[in-house]
C-alpha cells in the first residue's frame, strides 16, 4: 500500500520520544531540483486525524551545515527534550524543538571536538544527559549535556583497535556504560565508557555501515555492511564474535540503515541499496513485511514509539514516507500477502506485543473479577477480586436470611412491621400489613383481618369503649337525660275485618297455607311468618323465601346467601368497590376449601375490574402464591423507578417467601420459577453462592427450565467441589437418626379456612422445640432443614442441614411458631406418636439379598439382575485374595449390599425418576456387554445431572464398576 503521510524532503529523521512530532534535517550530499545548498532543521506534526497527506510544518530553523545523522533525546529544560544533529563540518548542533509560540526552533549551541563529518550519534536512554558521537576521524566522544563544554569521555582506538571513519554507534540497552561503535574499515569495538577501555572488538574485511544492540539480550549485537558483496545482517554474541548467532539474508545490495522495534524486539527494520525496506522476525530470521519498492533506496528508517507498527523511511529521491506496517505486503509488491496473514502463517502462536493487552480484566461468575498486568515482575501473575456492586443489597439479603433462619414468627412479624413503616407506597404498606396479620397467633388472625378491613365485632367495640372513662361518663348522661316515655296504654292495631275473618276461618279449618297467603295480601309479614312456623317446615321455608324475595333491604341478601349457603352467587353480585366488605363477610362465614375458592373468585373479579391491589390482597388471603407472584412480577418494571432491578427483585422475593410461610403450593408457576432464577442470578453476582444454591434447592429438578438448569450447574460447579468427595465418603457410615430429618410436622390450621395449596419453602434452621404438639398432625414425609454453616454444595447428597426439594415436602416453610393463613376452626388431630410410648424396633435396611423386587416394572428388571451379578463378581473374587482383614472385607461388602438394596427398594416403590432410570438402564446394558468404560462414563454423567437423587448409591456403583473392570483384566 502507499504511505499514509509524507514530507517532500530528502532528510535524516528523528522522532520525538514523547510527543507526536518528527524532525527532519537536510541530508548531506542531497541535491534537489532547485540545486539549493541550504541546510534546514524542520519539525512536523504527526497528526493522523487529519485527512491531509502532507504533514504540517510546525517549526523550522537554518543550520550552518547539512546533516549526516539526527537524534532526539528526552534531556532538556522543556518537555520536548533536545535535538542533536551530526553535521558535515564535525560539529554537533543542539536545538530546543519548540522554544516559543512562534514556532521557531532555538539553536542552543554547537559541540566541537571532531575533525570530520559526524555519522554516529545517539542519546543514552538510561542516562538521558549522555550523548555519544562518532566521526570520520575515528574518535568517539561522550558528551554530558549538563556540562557540554567538552567531552566527558574521549574514546580512540590505538594499534590494532584503530578505527577509521565511524559509521554508527549504539548504547547497550542493559548497561549504560557500555557503548559499541563500528567503522568503514570493518572494525567493531565494544567500549567501557567509564574506564575508557575496550572490552572486545571484531575485525572483518567488509565495510560496516550500521549496528544495533539487542534490546533483550544485552550480550548480542547486530552489525550490517553497505557493501554489495556482503549485504547480510549478522546477529553476534560478543562472547563468540567469530560465529554469528543468526544471519538475516534478504537484501541483494548493501544495508544502509536499520532500527530495532522499541515496542516489540521480535521485529527489526532494515533498508538497503537494493531499494528494499524489510521488516524481519529476529527470532526466525524470516521476512515479516516489506515496504513498497520505490524508484530509489531509503537511507534512514525509524519506528514511531507512540504508535506501534508505524514507521518512517527517508529516500534519496526526496521523500519522507510514513507507513503503517500492518498494511504492507510480506514479500514485496509482487506478492501482496497481508502482514497479519504472514504473521499467522509464519508463527501462529506469536503476535506483535502491541497487539497484546498491557492489562486486562474480566468479570467472572460469582461476583468475581480477574485482572492481569504485563508490567508486573511476575508475568504470569493474575489477581482475583471479589466484587459486591450492591453492598446495601448484600446487607439486606443477610438480614433477611437471618430472619428466615431464626424461624420465629415474632422475628418475621417484626420484619413485616419494619417493612410497613419503610414502605414508600400505599400498596407496599397494605401488602406488608396483611402479611403481618397472617403471621399472628392462633385464633387472632381472623379477628385481626376483619379489623384490618374495618369491621369489628360489637363486643370488641364495647370492650374498647369500656376502657375509656370519658366514654362511660358520656353514655351514662345520655341514659339519664334521654328517657323514653312509657306508653299510656295499648292501642289495638287497626285492620280490615274482612282480612281478619278470612285468616281466622283458614286457621279454624287448619289451612295454614291459605292463612299465610291472606297475611301476605294484607301485608302482615310478621303474622305470615308466625303462622308458617306453625304450619310445618315446608310452609315455613317457602314463606321465608318469599319474604326475603319481597324485601328490598340490602342485608337480606346476606341473610339469603347464608341460608342457602351460596356465598359464591352473592359474591358475583357485589360491586368491586365494596371488596373489603365482601372479604370480611367471607372471612366470617366461609369454611374449609370454600375460603380459598371464594377468595380466588373475588380476586379474579377485582383483577378483571382493574382493582390490582385489592386482587393481590385477596390472592394473598387465598394463599395463591402463583397468582400473587404473577401480579407482582408484572408490576416489577413499574416499581423500578428510583431503585435498581436487583433491589426490586429483593423486595419481591421477601414478600414471596413471607407469603409462602403460611401457604402450601406443590405447583411452581413460570413466574415463580423466573423469580427464583432472577434472584439466584443476583445472589451469585454478589458472591453469595451458597445462599443462591440454598434457594435453588427449593425447586425440584423437574421444575427447572433450560436456563435455570444451566444456572444451577454453574452455581454447583462454582461451589466447593470437595464437598462431593466428603459427602460420598460419609455415605459409608451408618445412618444416625435425626428427628428433623425423619419427621415433618404439619401444623393445624387457624380459626378460619385452611388453603389447600402447598408451598415448598422451609425454615433455614431446625425448630428448637415443638410446642403445642397436640395441634400438629402425624409426621408424613422427610423434613430437611437448612443450616448456613454446614450446608453441603449442590453436588453433595442431601442430609441434615440442607434444603429438601419442593415436591418431596408437605409441610410449609414453618416451625411450631409459624401460623398458617387465615382459616376456620378445625378440630386438631391427636398425634399418633407419644413421648411415653416405647418406639417400635427399626427394621434392618434392605440388602441385595433381602430387598423386595416383586413390584419392579418389567422393563427395569434387567437393572436388578445386572447389578446383582456385578455385586457378586465384585466381592466373590476378593474373598480369597484381598489384603484387607476379614472384618474390613465384610464391612465393605455389607455397605455395598445396603446401598444396592436401597436402590432396589426405590425401583420397587417407583421412587426413581424417569431420567435416572433411563441412564441406569443404559449403564446396565453397557455392563452386560462388558463395556466398563462406557458404564463409567454414564456413571459420571449421572453424578453431574442426577446427584441429588442418586448420591447414596452412585459412589458405590463406581467402585463396583472399577473393581469389575480390574477383575476382567
Swiss-Prot record:
Pfam families named in the record: TPR_Sec16 (PF12931), WD40 (PF00400)
One term under GO cellular component: Golgi apparatus
Biological process (GO), any one: endoplasmic reticulum to Golgi vesicle-mediated transport
Cellular location(s): Golgi apparatus; Endoplasmic reticulum
InterPro entries, per the entry: Sec16_Sec23-bd, SEC31-like, WD40/YVTN_repeat-like_dom_sf, WD40_repeat_CS, WD40_repeat_dom_sf, WD40_rpt
WD repeat windows: 5-45, 62-105, 113-153, 161-201, 203-246, 250-290, 293-333, 510-550, 601-642
Region (Disordered): 457-499, 722-757
Biased composition (Polar residues): 464-478, 724-757
Positions with biased composition (Acidic residues): 487-499
Top-rank lineage group of the source organism: Eukaryota
Keyword Endoplasmic reticulum: yes
Keywords, comma-separated and alphabetical: Endoplasmic reticulum, ER-Golgi transport, Golgi apparatus, Protein transport, Repeat, Transport, WD repeat
Keyword Transport: yes
Listed PANTHER family: PROTEIN TRANSPORT PROTEIN SEC31 HOMOLOG A, SEC31-RELATED PROTEIN
Known role: Required for protein transport from the endoplasmic reticulum to the Golgi apparatus.
Family: Belongs to the WD repeat SEC31 family.
Assembly information from the UniProt record: Interacts with MAG5, SEC13A and SEC13B.
Name by which UniProt lists this protein: Protein transport protein SEC31 homolog A
Gene, per the UniProt record: SEC31A
